[in-house]
Amino acid sequence: MRVAKKVQGSRFLGVVFVSALVAAGCGAGGDDESTDEATATTEAVVTTTEAPAATTTTTEAAPTTTEAPAITTTTEPPLGWQKILAGDDCACSDGSEYSYWVREGDPSKVMLFFDGGGACFSAESCDPNGSPTYSIRADDNPNEAASGVFDLENPENPVGDWTMIFMPYCTGDGHLGTNAGHDYGEGIIINHTGFLNGLKGFDEIVANYGTADQILVTGSSAGGIPVPLFAGLLADALPDTEILGLPDASGGYPSNPLINGVIGGVWGTEGAIPYWSTTEGVTAAEMGIPELFTYAGLEFPDIRWARFDHAYDGTQASFSALAGLEDSSVKAVLDINEGLTEDAGVDLPVYIAPGTEHTIMGRAEMYELEVEGVRYVDWLTDFIAGEAIDDVVCTDCGAPS
């Protein structure tokens, strides 16, 4: 089922599209299937088979006040990560099964995190038996992550007690693809179905956390690319919820219509275009980084945005070169993309750190980084709290020699 296409946008069509998303995607019904692999080193783990339904009758003895101690939920530790098999129709690039992870926390505050792991768009870059430039399987396990927003013991973590949904990445398409079984020739057939897999996170929130007060959509590297799209989809589905979007380490890719169209054609990005008034007539050629912010930001002006990047991010530079944009400067493109977004009427505060490092949200540096006298974790905390934040941009940005 094609879940999206370019059509004339309207509020009614938007509602229809969101309703379709809940029922569409890959492996309908797979959300309810959990595995036995949900483990945490010190935390309790919940699975769907953990507590069978009680069977009581009216003839059972009534409990006394001393039979069981009172439960004090305020002192219980957060629950561990639960691995959920997405369903038979969800798949990684090589056809292996796709699963995502949920960590129960405060149900009124939810973080949807998209994992990174490269990209591919040619036989050479996608060949799993060669030198692939992307993660082939959904092997990342948040139980093994203990840095950045996943450092649940750090008192400075602004989302430490939130419910978290972690979407692994294994399709090489920036979580934007809807093209299953793309044939690159030479026997290389790849599932670029990252958007369809990502809809499982959307479904999880709408079905189980639809009354949340606040949802932060974020992701690092390739996981930052779909943030505006999924923030918009959630704003459409949950109009009473405050939606925040913060991509990490993905703002420095130029929007070139020719390259957008070629790569988008391989990935099937047109299948991810929502039914919004701002996307009327949009094709894959107009699915660049600043455009995604513009479509979602203008359609849903209550979404609050922010963005993090390193000024000369070496990974972003290398993938721009791989796509044929050798002359692009990451810092210059960061400035251009921010300008295009804000000129279109979408406010986008940015935090640009010096150097060539890549990502911040899953690293210990999240608590250590300070630029122009402003700590990143303080800037992030203020953003989440709804405080006004300004651009923080390095003056000595450490351009590589």
Regions found by a protein language model. Give the residues of each.
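C-terminal His-loop and adjacent cap/lid subdomain of alpha/beta-hydrolase
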Residues: 67-401
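C-terminal motif of bacterial Sec signal peptides marking the signal peptidase cleavage site
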Residues: 22-25
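Extracellular mucin-like PTS domains
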Residues: 34-76
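Bacterial N-terminal signal peptides that target proteins for export
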Residues: 3-14
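Bacterial signal peptide processing site
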Residues: 27-30
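Sec-dependent N-terminal signal peptides
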Residues: 15-20
